[in-house]
């Protein structure tokens, strides 16, 4: 059995096989996931796991180069945004890089998810709790 954080086989595989600039989307329970996408459904019940718990676990194993968020999160979910940005700042320090954050419309965000190597659905039930993580290289 693995000793590292993530023990979900699908999620572990998705992270392990990411190449430079490939993306992984983490989303709330309501984001539409295209049928053609690699859906990694972690949602168990409302709020379990939370978006932030999912983000913390994924970023413990993934080197993040940049992130993409829907601009609507600024107005509709400032609490999650504040925690998310604080986490990305701490992660950047730990990784020794900057993690630029790009804000796009929710419609554009949904289109960008089509290119993700995986879409990880959490049990989060708050608006716009979604992020596209762009994979970097740790060297």
UniProtKB/Swiss-Prot annotation:
Signal peptide: none annotated. Substrate binds at residues 28, 106, 128-130. One of its GO terms (molecular function) is intramolecular lyase activity. Its main location: cytoplasm. Its EC number is 5.4.99.62. It is an enzyme of class 5 (isomerase). Pathway: Carbohydrate metabolism; D-ribose degradation; D-ribose 5-phosphate from beta-D-ribopyranose: step 1/2. One of its GO terms (biological process) is D-ribose catabolic process. Keywords: Carbohydrate metabolism, Cytoplasm, Isomerase. It catalyses: beta-D-ribopyranose = beta-D-ribofuranose. One of its GO terms (cellular component) is cytosol. The active site is at residue 20. It is found in: Cytoplasm. Gene3D superfamilies: RbsD-like domain. Pfam families: RbsD_FucU. Catalyzes the interconversion of beta-pyran and beta-furan forms of D-ribose. Belongs to the RbsD / FucU family. RbsD subfamily. Homodecamer. This is D-ribose pyranase. It comes from Actinobacillus succinogenes (strain ATCC 55618 / DSM 22257 / CCUG 43843 / 130Z). The lineage of its organism: Bacteria, Pseudomonadati, Pseudomonadota, Gammaproteobacteria, Pasteurellales. The gene is rbsD.
